[in-house]
UniProtKB/Swiss-Prot annotation:
Gene expressing this chain: nikE
Family statement drawn from the similarity comment of this UniProt entry: Belongs to the ABC transporter superfamily. Nickel importer (TC 3.A.1.5.3) family.
N-terminal signal peptide: none
Keyword Membrane: yes
GO MF, one annotated term: ATP hydrolysis activity
Enzyme Commission code(s) on record: 7.2.2.11
Gene Ontology cellular component list: plasma membrane
Name assigned to this protein: Nickel import ATP-binding protein NikE
PANTHER family the UniProt entry points to: D,D-DIPEPTIDE TRANSPORT ATP-BINDING PROTEIN DDPF-RELATED, TRANSPORT ATP-BINDING PROTEIN
Length: 268
């Protein structure tokens, strides 16, 4: 089943120019893609190529200058109030900048309950139980519930944001560099959790990343973005190779997970 369909998407930002005239900076150019239920897709590209802007458009935080975005066959621009509420529940996003994604005055308990209060019909006791369950799933415990964001480490806060997104059991989870910054052990644990969610609920995942190792470990398809365009799409196999210049540059930039020991024939 197709969850998300994007056709001919273009976007630009206006900024001031000389003589008070606005100039337009193109960020996305004729982007088209589809995401199906239960699949895991990576959007790979260097910083500044338009990945995060595309993500904001996909979740409805901004409206595109041109093109169409449809959720389960319905254009986002035509969703009624009830459909838009269901859309906000079904598609969740975890941002790279976790500090800006939360209210620093609220406790973790309040942060986790917020989407459940607005998007689900759960009693307070059920919300608290699910909050505890989601914390455990991201390797945190109830001791953080009464803490506020400034009292948490960056990795802890990122996992709180992930738990908040998972609490409403979304159909599509978009992670904007949200896993790449975790250490390898935590990253592996989060990936196991996401795989479990896919099996249970058919959750689709879109990883927005520059981390090729993450793509190879978890994704089924990868789209390469460069200068606001998707320049290549590949199925992830045993040996992932790219045909585009942008893809090859990213692949060549990957460092080995562990130092490679050089063999030497010199005798001491």
């Amino acid at each position: 089943m197709t969850l998300l369909n994007v056709s001919g998407l273009s976007h630009h930002y206006a900024h001031g120019g000389f003589n008070g005239k606005h100039q337009h900076q193109a960020v996305l150019n004729n982007v088209s893609l589809t995401l199906k239920s239960g699949e895991t897709v990576a959007l790979l590209g260097r910083s500044g190529c338009g990945k995060s802007t595309l993500a904001r458009l996909l979740v409805g935080l901004e409206s595109p200058a041109q093109g169409n975005i449809s959720w389960r066959g319905e254009p986002l621009a035509k969703l009624n109030r009830a459909q838009r509420k269901a859309f906000r529940r079904d598609i969740q996003m975890v941002f790279q900048d976790s500090i800006s994604a939360v209210n620093p005055r609220k406790t973790v308990r309040e942060i986790l309950r917020e989407p459940m209060r607005h998007l689900l019909s759960l009693k307070k006791s059920e919300q608290l139980a699910r909050a505890s369950e989601m914390l455990k799933a991201v390797d945190l415990d109830d001791s953080v519930l009464d803490k506020r964001p400034p009292q948490l480490s960056g990795g802890q806060l990122q996992r709180v944001c992930l738990a908040r997104a998972l609490a409403v059991e979304p159909k599509l989870l978009i992670l904007d560099e949200a896993v790449s910054n975790l250490d390898l052990v935590l990253q592996a644990g989060v990936i196991r959790l996401l795989k479990k969610l896919q099996q249970q609920f058919g959750t689709a995942c879109l990883f927005i990343t520059h981390d090729l190792r993450l793509v190879e470990r978890f994704c089924q398809r990868v789209m390469v973005m460069d200068n606001g365009q998707i320049v290549e799409t590949q199925v992830v196999g045993d040996k992932l190779t790219f045909s585009s210049d942008a893809g090859r540059v990213l692949q060549n930039a990957v460092l080995p997970a562990f130092p490679v020991r050089r063999r030497t024939t010199e005798k001491v």
